[in-house]
């Protein structure tokens, strides 16, 4: 079969027709290798966005991004989980998932956290980790050591996806969301089989969870807060797409289901990484309120995804215990010391 040409692919998007799996693999390899011109890369990614990317197109693109990535080899992945968001929710909340990372590890799961610098928020996960004193530029083997010994490994996305340099200028100049915004969370370099993923639009809940299903994930929760948050929200109901035992089901959860008080995002907003760090540290040091509640809720969901907890309720209880005991704060201190020692 003759490979699809970029011009044919562009025409498909204009006609709102799907680019099939093998064609998308070929096209994505051209993009990631720098073979495709910036003009065609921009045209095709914009065309895909306008027609709306299909599960098949997203799955194929994620497979190629994984092919081109620098991987972290983790041998025991039974309770390995990633907690990640697509970003783009515009809520400017503090680093909820980064804070939850320490709670999750303290409660017995292992976290391979995959993230970058700020895209739409005031503070990205890499910005937050750096502000806390974590060394984020480690080699893949060192990150694997961190996961094994501390229970947390932070993978700074640009270090693991060098081929993205071929796309970065196009993405920056376009300034609109493209397929790459939803590929990052699907391409964990440590191959975490379990994931809690927040998305920026309700349509993506069903799409991303089915892409994860096709990509071989084991236990996944894809969530969208009805108030627009790409986390499990305290301010509204949260749509959930869950992949478990090979099957997908979709449902909605509410804070009061877990005995938590509803709270809007205003109390969680920050203006810069300094404010985000202060709120994050407050949670780890025992401050009560909406920030603590939303961290526990999301950490609890990740513990359920990691198969450490039997249910969301059990996960929440374990997360609350990890914070109350001081174990989550100790986990942060352990990670800082360990990464600084490795980087020395």
Curated annotation (Swiss-Prot):
GO molecular function: anthranilate phosphoribosyltransferase activity; magnesium ion binding
Cofactor requirements of the protein: Mg(2+)
Residues annotated as binding 5-phospho-alpha-D-ribose 1-diphosphate: 85, 88-89, 93, 95-98, 113-121, 125
Binding-site list for Mg(2+) 1: 97, 231
Reaction(s) catalysed by this chain's protein: N-(5-phospho-beta-D-ribosyl)anthranilate + diphosphate = 5-phospho-alpha-D-ribose 1-diphosphate + anthranilate
Binding site for Mg(2+) 2: 230-231
UniProt keyword annotations, A-Z: Amino-acid biosynthesis, Aromatic amino acid biosynthesis, Glycosyltransferase, Magnesium, Metal-binding, Transferase, Tryptophan biosynthesis
Binding of anthranilate 1, residues: 85
E.C. designation(s): 2.4.2.18
Record's cofactor remark: Binds 2 magnesium ions per monomer.
Xref: SUPFAM superfamilies: Nucleoside phosphorylase/phosphoribosyltransferase catalytic domain (SSF52418), Nucleoside phosphorylase/phosphoribosyltransferase N-terminal domain (SSF47648)
Gene Ontology CC terms: cytosol
Matching PANTHER family: ANTHRANILATE PHOSPHORIBOSYLTRANSFERASE
Biological function: Catalyzes the transfer of the phosphoribosyl group of 5-phosphorylribose-1-pyrophosphate (PRPP) to anthranilate to yield N-(5'-phosphoribosyl)-anthranilate (PRA).
UniProt similarity note: Belongs to the anthranilate phosphoribosyltransferase family.
Assembly: Homodimer.
Protein's name in the database: Anthranilate phosphoribosyltransferase
Organism whose genome encodes this protein: Acidovorax ebreus (strain TPSY)
Gene: trpD
């Amino acid at each position: 079969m003759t490979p699809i040409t970029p011009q044919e692919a562009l025409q498909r998007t204009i006609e709102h027709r799907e680019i099939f799996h093998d064609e998308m693999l070929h096209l994505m390899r051209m993009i990631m290798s720098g073979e495709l011109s910036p003009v065609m890369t921009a045209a095709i990614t914009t065309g895909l966005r306008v027609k709306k990317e299909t599960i098949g197109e997203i799955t194929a693109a994620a497979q190629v991004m994984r092919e081109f990535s620098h991987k972290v080899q983790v041998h025991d992945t039974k309770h390995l989980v990633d907690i990640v968001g697509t970003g783009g929710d515009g809520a400017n909340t503090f680093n909820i998932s980064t804070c939850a990372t320490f709670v999750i590890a303290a409660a017995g799961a292992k976290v391979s956290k995959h993230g970058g610098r700020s895209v739409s928020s005031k503070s990205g996960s890499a910005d937050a980790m750096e502000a806390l004193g974590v060394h984020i530029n480690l080699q893949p083997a060192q990150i694997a050591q961190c996961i094994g010994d501390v229970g947390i490994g932070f993978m700074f996305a640009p270090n693991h996806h060098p081929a993205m340099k071929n796309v970065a200028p196009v993405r920056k100049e376009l300034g609109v969301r493209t397929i790459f915004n939803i590929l990052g969370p699907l391409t964990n370099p440590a191959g975490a089989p379990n994931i809690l993923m927040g998305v920026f639009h309700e349509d993506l809940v069903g799409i991303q969870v089915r892409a994860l299903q096709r990509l071989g994930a084991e236990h996944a929760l894809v969530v969208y807060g009805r108030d627009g948050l790409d986390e499990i929200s305290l301010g509204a109901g949260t749509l959930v797409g869950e992949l478990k035992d090979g099957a997908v089901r979709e449902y909605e959860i509410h804070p009061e289901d877990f005995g938590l008080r509803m709270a809007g995002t205003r109390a969680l907003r920050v203006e810069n990484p300094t404010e985000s760090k202060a709120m994050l540290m407050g949670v780890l040091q025992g401050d009560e309120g909406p920030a603590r509640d939303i961290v526990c809720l999301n950490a609890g969901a990740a513990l359920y995804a990691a198969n450490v907890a039997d249910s969301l309720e059990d996960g929440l209880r374990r997360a609350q215990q990890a914070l109350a005991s001081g174990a989550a704060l100790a986990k942060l201190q352990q990670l800082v010391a360990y990464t600084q020692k490795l980087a020395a």
